[in-house]
């Protein structure tokens, strides 16, 4: 197939997906190790392309990678309870610093990755105090300090920014009614934002190709039930990520995708091709086989009637 023929075929394949996703809200959670260098530049270009096609984008970034680098620089070993970082006052200051660094880098990348035919001007990046948080408190006898959990998402204010054509950028930080700031989980934050907005899609960009089954094979599709079995059966499964996916799907989000964000074009392939990329998770099985029931008989007859009449 020639290059032109391949382009035409690919564009025809993508067209229905482009039409369907126009005007839909998509929340993208990104591990912060992807938000640097060439990977950030490529990702920013793809996000700008999606915005130009009419998707309403909310980007939630992580902070663990850069926080670990800062801790290493001061010879400090981070403390965890399970998968959650224990946030003392010194760490909280670094959390705020990291959020500012990442936000600035992402804004600059989105601003500079616009190509002239695509947009007349760079996208507006909207940030704000959209998240109300509360402390996690004491878990299994461990005081989590300034590590928090989401109390409320100001969905109305986020929608106002999206209605105005902005790309919304959210850091994993939340503030309490008493004026304290808390360090949040990126997975939980992205999940809660997607639920509050009733997003069409929640996409997690990670360092992995997707979710692997217990035997090591890549799962292209999973249902909520299969994810819950995987969490139970596979101790190496990314539980925080999968719990966020299940929580989102059980509360109105249509689809969750988990992709390798370092792979060039993985987000576009997942959204606009039949084959997709990574792992796609839905509430119900993509294909299920069961014993026929008596109430299936009319549908079975309707299926075989054209063959019987030939």
Positions of predicted regions on the chain:
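Charged, low-complexity C-terminal accessory regions
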Residues: 106-107, 276-280, 306
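Conserved GNAT-fold acetyl-CoA-binding loop/helix
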Residues: 304-310
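Nucleotide/pyrophosphate-binding catalytic subdomain
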Residues: 1-255, 259-262, 293-299, 304
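Conserved N-terminal entry element of GNAT/NAT acetyltransferase domains
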Residues: 272-295
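Active-site catalytic pocket residues across diverse enzymes, especially alpha/beta-hydrolases
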Residues: 71-74, 271, 275
């Amino acid at each position: 197939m020639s290059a032109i023929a391949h382009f035409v075929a690919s564009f025809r394949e993508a067209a229905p997906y482009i039409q369907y996703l126009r005007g839909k809200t998509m929340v993208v959670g990104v591990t912060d190790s992807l938000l640097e260098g060439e990977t950030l530049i490529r990702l920013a270009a793809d996000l700008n392309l999606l915005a130009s096609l009419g998707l309403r984008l909310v980007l939630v970034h992580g902070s663990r990678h850069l926080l670990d680098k800062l801790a290493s620089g001061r010879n400090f070993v981070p403390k965890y309870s399970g998968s959650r970082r224990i946030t003392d006052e010194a760490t909280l200051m670094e959390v705020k610093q990291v959020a500012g660094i990442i936000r600035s880098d992402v804004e600059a990348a989105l601003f500079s990755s616009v190509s002239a035919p695509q947009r007349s001007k760079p996208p507006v990046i909207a940030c704000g105090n959209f998240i109300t948080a509360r402390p996690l408190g004491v878990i299994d006898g461990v005081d989590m300090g300034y590590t928090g959990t989401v109390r409320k998402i100001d969905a109305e204010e986020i929608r106002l920014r999206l209605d105005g054509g902005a790309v919304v950028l959210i850091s994993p930080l939340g503030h309490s009614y008493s004026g304290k700031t808390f360090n949040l989980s990126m997975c939980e934050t992205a999940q809660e934002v997607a639920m509050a907005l009733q997003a069409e899609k929640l996409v997690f960009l990670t360092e992995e190709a997707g979710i692997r089954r217990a035997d090591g094979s890549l799962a292209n599709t999973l249902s909520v039930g299969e994810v819950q079995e995987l969490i139970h059966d596979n101790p190496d499964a990314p539980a925080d990520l999968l719990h966020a996916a299940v929580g989102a799907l059980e509360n109105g989000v249509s689809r969750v995708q988990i992709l390798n964000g370092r792979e060039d074009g993985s987000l576009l392939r997942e959204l606009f091709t039949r084959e997709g990329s990574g792992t796609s998770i839905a509430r119900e099985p993509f294909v299920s086989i069961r014993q026929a029931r008596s109430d299936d008989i009319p549908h079975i007859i309707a299926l075989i009637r054209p063959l019987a009449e030939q």
